[in-house]
């Protein structure tokens, strides 16, 4: 679930379903229906910091009780799901590092310190009772140069395939991917790389 779509309080109801008397009441909730149909699932809440604070109440129910009751009174069992929350909270502590962080000699201690700062930042945002129910908080390293190059190659390959479907032939050298990756250095992942492909190539 892209949590940027659940920023308003009324949008949180979509996860559990509309209450009786409202449009879409008979459809059930997006989250509860998905788990009811596939109880052995990985449920990803992407960029959780963008969600309305009421989402934390839903997460507390999932993590405490292992189930949610939708607007129609049906229970969705989460005991066999893996729930992941992703966030950019604390990413500013990893910003400004030269690539590839963690691979140069002596940078492990620096990364550990930055990870601790990022985790503290996340703990300030989440309610304490929710943090207490999380199994683990993990900080991912910024993408290394070779990873960004591989992603650039994939994006360029997708662009070439789209062009071929429209009757055009595009080719590129490996250097193009490396240049795009160098331009796209960002502590926030590969989104900037997609923008570079859009701007510079498309």
Across the structure, where does each feature detected by a protein language model lie?
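AAA+ P-loop NTPase nucleotide-binding core of proteostasis motors
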Residues: 1-202
């Amino acid at each position: 679930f892209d949590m940027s779509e659940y920023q308003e309080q009324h949008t949180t109801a979509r996860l559990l379903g509309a209450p009786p008397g409202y449009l879409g009441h008979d459809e059930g909730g997006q989250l509860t229906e998905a788990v009811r149909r596939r109880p052995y699932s990985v449920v990803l809440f992407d960029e959780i910091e963008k969600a309305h604070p009421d989402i934390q109440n839903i997460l507390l129910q999932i993590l405490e009780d292992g189930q949610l009751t939708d607007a129609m009174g049906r229970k969705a069992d989460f005991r066999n799901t893996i729930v992941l929350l992703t966030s950019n909270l604390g990413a500013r502590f990893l910003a400004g590092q030269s690539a590839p962080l963690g691979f140069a000699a002596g940078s492990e201690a620096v990364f550990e310190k930055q990870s601790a700062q990022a985790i503290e930042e996340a703990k300030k945002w989440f309610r304490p009772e929710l943090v207490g129910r999380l199994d683990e908080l993990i900080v991912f390293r910024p993408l290394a140069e070779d990873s960004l190059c591989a992603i650039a190659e994939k994006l360029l390959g997708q662009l070439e395939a789209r062009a071929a479907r429209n009757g055009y032939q595009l080719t590129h050298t490996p250097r193009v991917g490396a240049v795009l990756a160098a331009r796209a250095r960002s502590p926030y992942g590969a989104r900037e790389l997609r923008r570079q492909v859009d701007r510079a190539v498309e």
